[in-house]
Amino acid sequence: MTIKSDKWIRRMAESHKMIEPFAPDQVRVSEDGRKIVSYGTSSYGYDIRCADEFKIFTNINSTIVDPKNFDEKSFVDFKGDVCIIPPNSFALARTVEYFRIPRSVLTVCLGKSTYARCGIIVNVTPFEPEWEGHVTLEFSNTTPLPAKIYANEGVAQVLFFESDEICETSYADRGGKYQGQHGVTLPRT
């Protein structure tokens, strides 16, 4: 597998709608002139943005966290430009961008150092061949203080790897449970 360059990412986004909406260059300043956490195309990746829809984890129901039977009431829904994550807690969000991954491609997503250096960890699983949808993002606040996440700014970088051989079975072929997801998607079994 080889990592794909900015030229390939631009070509695939423009001709195959691999990323929508798409920023062909790095964006570091907002439309009103403010400095922001960068997003858009980088040398060998694409920096994704967080939308303004969040699910903030709370344990008001004193429930047990069970990935096979997750209680949706464990979250508080929030919509806004800045999400405050409680100390030692987490929040879910989704990307602004909608992805359509080619059959020969697998992605790996890594959190941006701007957040990591503040104790905020971004976790995303790989985007599998022929998966499509908005990406659900998980932000862990590892600090003993509240932490901010900024909507419509960069939060993580997606790296695209192309195989020299097409996979036998893609995510779409398997009927993956997160195929075509919109909005923040909770665990499914």
Swiss-Prot record:
GO MF annotations, alphabetized: dCTP deaminase activity; nucleotide binding
Subunit and partners: Homotrimer.
EC number per UniProt: 3.5.4.13
NCBIfam families to which the protein is assigned, alphabetical: dCTP_deam
Pathway named in the protein's UniProt entry: Pyrimidine metabolism; dUMP biosynthesis; dUMP from dCTP (dUTP route): step 1/2
Protein name: dCTP deaminase
Keyword Hydrolase: yes
Binding-site positions, dCTP: 112-117, 136-138, 157, 171, 181
Catalytic machinery residues: 138
Catalytic activity: dCTP + H2O + H(+) = dUTP + NH4(+)
Any coiled-coil regions, as ranges: none
Family statement drawn from the similarity comment of this UniProt entry: Belongs to the dCTP deaminase family.
A biological-process GO annotation: dUTP biosynthetic process
Protein's job: Catalyzes the deamination of dCTP to dUTP.
Keywords on record: Hydrolase, Nucleotide metabolism, Nucleotide-binding
CDD domains attached to this UniProt entry: trimeric_dUTPase
One Pfam family this sequence matches: DCD
InterPro entries linked to this entry: dCTP_deaminase (IPR011962), dUTPase-like_sf (IPR036157), dUTPase_trimeric (IPR033704)
